[in-house]
Amino acid sequence: MKRNILILLLLSLSWAAAAQQSTTLSGTITDEASGDPLPGVAIFFPDLRQGALSDMQGRYTIGSLPQIRTQIQVSLLGHQTIVRDIDLKTVRTLDFSLKESNATLSEVVVTGLTGTETKRNSPAPVTIVTPEILRGQASSNLIDALAKQPGVSQITTGGGISKPVIRGMGYNRVLVVTDGVRQEGQQWGDEHGVEVDAESVNSVEILKGPASLMYGSDALAGVVVLHGAAVPPQGKIGVRAGAEYQSNNGLLGYTVNTSGNQNGLVWNWRWTQKVAHDYRNAADGLVPNSRYRERGVSGLVGLSKRWGYSHLKLSWFHLTPGMVEGEREEDGTLEAFDNGKSYRPGLPFQQVNHYKAVWDNSLVLGEGSLKATVGYQQNRRQEYEESADEPGLDFLLHTVNYNFYYKSPESNGWKNVAGVGGMWQASDNLGEEVLIPAYNLFDAGTYITTCKDLGYWHISAGIRADARWLRSHALEDRFAAFDRTFLGITGSVGAIRNLGENANLRLNLSRGFRAPNISELGSNGEHEGTFRYEVGNPDLKPEYSWQLDAGFDYSSRILSAEVSLFTNLAQNYIYLGRSAGETVEDAPVYRFLSGLASLSGGEATVDVHPVERLHFENAFSWVIAVRPGEPEESRYLPFTPAPRWLSTLRYDLIRDGKVLNNTYISAQMDWNFAQNRIYAAGGTETATPGYILLNLSAGTDFRLKGKTVASLYLTADNLLDTVYQSHLSRLKYAAVNPLNGVQGVFNPGRNLGIKLILKW
């Protein structure tokens, strides 16, 4: 009966949506100073996921649009982005004049919030990572590519595994959202990365601070929202192919992509492969078993019509990383089983398969819209220790995600959104070894948000209620069964004061919530690659936090600057602490503890343009994480990133040439300060000295008859081959070198990279 009611409801909504009248929008885009037409300008409707590119005469046409009020975004590299509200009931023609700008703080639409909103009107800090930034870097994985953004760090284990950290918090405090659903892949583990093909990601939004309002539990630190490429314009079919090479670990990467739009029938398919042998540094030489292999297949097929869109997204991601053990010979060299140039991981290694199917829908209902997303994920994570034939550890996780929200018509200037969302999970242990108990989980949340423009002011607020039920299964002599229920009320209120066209002040107060994960509650075992034996606590309480954000930004033709400050007080903050003198099978024992925590810090960025086309970009980020009232050795929260200063000098050689376009050269100083604020109790962690890395890069697009047909990028990271250890590298705690008494394995040395992208 319930199923029939649901089917009737969906059919009625579909009929209502189909009744929408369609319209067409066209226009011309020119340069404000010269009046010349601008080709290659991206015109995009974020709510509708539709767009187009301007032709050689600067003209564009987008058809099959619903007659609604929505937002349009117009952007071109080297020019100020325009974001404007538009009523498609009355507007049929709309021209734009783009102003050339050196400023990096341009206006964009943020879709990771409740509905769409401009970055200018977001009271909480948001970082936008553009396609140009992603393509212009040499990275081992997606999170590695994001880790140079202010306030973002990564926990690494070897060459191919990275976990995001936002403002000093990671693991289950940072959500990764892709294809509209939260990524679920056993993210409680140190050596469990993010199972996403980096080539399938076109742009990224990084929401800093508690985002529990939209996403529920686990968004205490923030959210990383991954976006694929927009649906191609009507009648367009495109093919892209890319290849890259990196010298340090011999990385070879290939990707092929095809996409198209025929009368609203859209598709986008991609295949990717990446292999790397052991990386090297000047202290350790080749680091045995730091190699990895990666493959990915993803596809989208669906309809984009006047009533909205309905897309089915399918993906498979496979990763086989070697696990660095860091054992050493008497002469201090790392124990190796081959010459380090093989692309096949040796024992121990992981084998990760992540399957995902997402049905993503957006229906236009009168002046409002309904967004409905349902997803299924299967994560199979196997670890081979003694034999390549049978895994010792074998995790199988099933997840069903759901998210529905309704964006009501604007009423007296108020924009309201109401929604529900949550997930169901079932996890099982299929191997002989176990670390966590098998479990079932279900959570659900409901929320409402509102915002309004009041002249120079923009205000927003929201509230959410969450409930999570978790039941673990007993295993004789290892795990006792337990049932837990976690309830949380979260919310936020914020305001922005526009100080004219170029500057803004913002203030936001938010309440965060996070239920303990299964590892914190029930773990009991040693995981290869973590160098420790972890013991959970089934009596842990959920984390609650209050965070205050304050910010200021300014942007002009020659200067852009942004300052974001925060202070966060978290109750029942969960962390790992080493039990002094306690070991299990020679592995040190770490137990999950909790208590009051205070985190504060921020990010400051300044981009100065002393002459035309010259960018001098500086970004400084820091966080201080303490446990109030605790003695010095246990005063600081463990594994907090060190302060960091990124300084980049970039010159745009050619911006709009007939053959070469967007041509640049860049030099960067990456200064990671010493981290002496450590959790020293029980030897949990050690201090890390500071280091400076020098990076160079260059890139250009190639044009043929006004269209970009290829892009080339060259990079040189750690040019001086500096020997260093990141404070958040798990390999920092590998075995001690008997020759010099230094513990752990060092990070990669000099790395030269080349990347070529072809477009048809």
Please report, for each region that a protein language model flagged, where it lies by residue.
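Short, acidic Ser/Thr/Gly-rich low-complexity loop/linker segments typical of extracellular
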Residues: L48-R59
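Short Pro-Gly-centered beta-turn/loop motif in secreted/extracellular proteins
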Residues: G35-P39, T61-R69
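Short, acidic, small-residue-rich periplasmic hinge/interaction motif at the N-terminus
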Residues: T28-S34, V41-P46, Q73-Q80, K89-R135, ...
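Short solvent-exposed capping/turn motifs at the termini of beta-strands
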Residues: T23, I29-A33, M56
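Exposed aromatic-hydrophobic patches
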Residues: R59-S64, D95-S97, G699
